[in-house]
Amino acid sequence: MAQGPARLTPLVVEGERYFTLQWQAGDTNGRSDVHGVIGNEFGFGARKVRLLIDSLDAAGGVTAQTIAYVPFDLPPGTRSYFEARVPARATSYRVSVFAWEWIQAGGGETLP
C-alpha cells in the first residue's frame, strides 16, 4: 500500500515557549482562512516567522497543511496579525510556529 506524503512538523521545537498564538477560522469572499495574532514573548526580536496550519478532520487527523508567513518582524514584547488561506473548510485547525530567525539587538544579525 502506498504511503501518503510526509507531514510537516515545526523546524524549531518549543516555539510556544517564545511565542503566543491566538487564531480563529473564517471565510473571506467565500474562501476559507485562518487568521489571528502572534506575540513575541522572548527578549530578542524575530523575523521570517512562519506558521504551520494543520487542517483537522473530526477525528483529529490532518487533512491538509499550510505554511503562513507573518508579514512583519516581531520586536520583543510585540504582536502581529496574520492571515492565511486554507485549502478547504476543516472541522478544526491547529496552528504552531514552524520556523523563525532571532535578531540580535543592535546589529541586525541573526542568531545561529
Task: List PLM regions with ranges.
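Asparagine-centered strand-capping/turn motif at beta-strand->loop junctions
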Residues: 38-43
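Beta-strand signatures of extracellular beta-sandwich domains
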Residues: 50-54
